[in-house]
Amino acid sequence: MSILVKNNIHWVGQRDWEVRDFHGTEYKTLRGSSYNSYLIREEKNVLIDTVDHKFSREFVQNLRSEIDLADIDYIIINHAEEDHAGALTELMAQIPDTPIYCTANAIDSINGHHHHPEWNFKVVKTGDTLDIGNGKQLIFVETPMLHWPDSMMTYMTGDAVLFSNDAFGQHYCDERLFNDEVDQTELFEQCQRYYANILTPFSRLVTPKITEILGFNLPVDMIATSHGVVWRDNPTQIVELYLKWAADYQEDRITIFYDTMSNNTRMMADAIAQGINEVDPNVAVKIFNVARSDKNEILTNVFRSKGVLVGTSTMNNVMMPKIAGLVEEMTGLRFRNKRASAFGSHGWSGGAVDRLSTRLQDAGFEMSLSLKAKWRPDLDALELCRQHGRDIARQWALAPLPETTQKTAPVEETTTCAAADLGPKMQCSVCQWIYDPALGEPLQDVAPGTPWSDVPDNFLCPECSLGKDVFDVLATEAK
């Protein structure tokens, strides 16, 4: 199957609706992906890239239905990774003498994967051209570390199509090929997710490389990526987004993520978020439990944020393993222009929060004070968490904050009456977790100030996941 891209250019790639893991299990491809290969038929026939190795046989069979393989004059490999050049061994078994145009670094990568040094490699550099007839040329532009040392782009004159490799792509599978045909919200979510999780470490290279390409003063009518859609409607919009994302990008957003053993650190996270919102109701605050959340969504939110609060319980005097792993990933992604603070609960000995603070600083974050709580935070400790959130909101504000009206403390009789109206605290008879009506349970959409009688029947204990029927009135409040 092929799809007409423009004039004598056809898409001959492979859709992968089922793929959910990429780069091992490091990247969750929740909307599948595609491996884009392009066949150009001018006076010379050119194949740009292949597909993932698991589709090698299918790819060659489909390609044979489009063209006699012996009629392919040139193969262009923009990138040697297996999702781009994976079908080379299957293809070259049929046409072993066909020249392969790629960078010098790509030869090393291709031989490292396919082990065929005898293939007919042709090394190209930035500015080199290849005449393909009918007055058209291919112009090559090296793009090292976007995102491998071997990467390059290929520009086709006449049709003004930039074959951009991984840049401007997204792991997004759709039967429709072009950017103006697909759901725009989904598309741009996946574009940002792709940039945040794959290209962020190389942001310092993005702007000068785009500037270099624009310096050729070549028109760009289409951008044909290696994954996802082909940009035919206003293709420069994605280029402009890349320039924006590469420039120490941040939004007025704070990301909080944590891991917890006994729910204590989660309670801290909720209270910190409440404090932030009290002082700055306009800032977007997102909370994630790393054990239950999509890691790449967390990292995308960190990319978007001006700051991040990371929480961990102490286990064996160190931070929780999932937190340690995610902080290591953030170190590799080399986020810039971001602030951070560590927090967490511990028992008889701490250690995790201090260790976490050091690791966040090593990862390049500008650090704010950390916060610790011993055992399960009581009302006083939770108020300290809220105050920490208030302080963070003020310290990390991007613009003057709205003035808050000082609340007058109610008389004691009113406070007692209000507290009584909420009813008693409830304790899980299995794990001893306590439901406090004053705090509610935000992760289950139970707002602070919700009496137990108004808690939905489908409520589950956050600790042991059992229902309301296992709860009793807290013994100290029973009459």
UniProtKB/Swiss-Prot annotation:
Binds 3 Fe cations per monomer. Residues 423-474 form the Rubredoxin-like domain. Disulfide bonds: none annotated. Its cofactor is Fe cation; FMN. Fe cation 1 binds at H79, E81, H147, D166. GO terms for molecular function: electron transfer activity; FMN binding; iron ion binding; nitric oxide reductase activity. It is found in: Cytoplasm. Coiled coil: none annotated. Fe cation 3 binds at C428, C431, C461, C464. It comes from the Bacteria. One of its GO terms (cellular component) is cytoplasm. Pathway: Nitrogen metabolism; nitric oxide reduction. SMART domains: Lactamase_B. FMN binds at residues 260-264, 342-369. The keyword ATP-binding does not apply. Fe cation 2 binds at D83, D166, H227. Residues 254-393 form the Flavodoxin-like domain. Its main location: cytoplasm. Keywords: Cytoplasm, Electron transport, Flavoprotein, FMN, Iron, Metal-binding, Oxidoreductase, Transport. Pfam families: Flavodoxin_1, ODP, Rubredoxin. Residues 30-210 are annotated as: Zinc metallo-hydrolase. Homotetramer. NCBIfam families: PRK05452.1. In the N-terminal section; belongs to the zinc metallo-hydrolase group 3 family. PANTHER family: ANAEROBIC NITRIC OXIDE REDUCTASE FLAVORUBREDOXIN (PTHR43717:SF1). This is Anaerobic nitric oxide reductase flavorubredoxin. The lineage of its organism: Bacteria, Pseudomonadati, Pseudomonadota, Gammaproteobacteria, Enterobacterales. The gene is norV.
